[in-house]
Amino acid sequence: MLSNSTSRNRHSKHNKKNTREDFDGYYFNKNVVICDDKGQKITAKVYKTSKYWLMLKTSDGKTIFMNKAFIKSIELAEEEEKDDLA
């Protein structure tokens, strides 16, 4: 019985490390083109990020909160790509 309780303690939430890798830092504060799950493209600047959400600012000043689960792809906007290459 003792081995079972030790096993549970070993897998407790307290001992787990967050090993989730994301790329938020790569596109943070850059202009991007996001393709959502419906195929719509949104061009905006990534203003803030969290575990599940992106806060985007469009060129006309509109704020969009987008759940990452509905994003198919994120590409740097053309002007950002040129800046990265320079």
Curated annotation (Swiss-Prot):
Lineage: Viruses, Viruses incertae sedis, Bicaudaviridae, Bicaudavirus
Basic residues bias (residue ranges): 8-17
Superkingdom of origin: Viruses
Organism, scientific name: Acidianus two-tailed virus (ATV)
Name under which the protein is recorded: Uncharacterized protein ORF86
Spans annotated as Disordered: 1-21
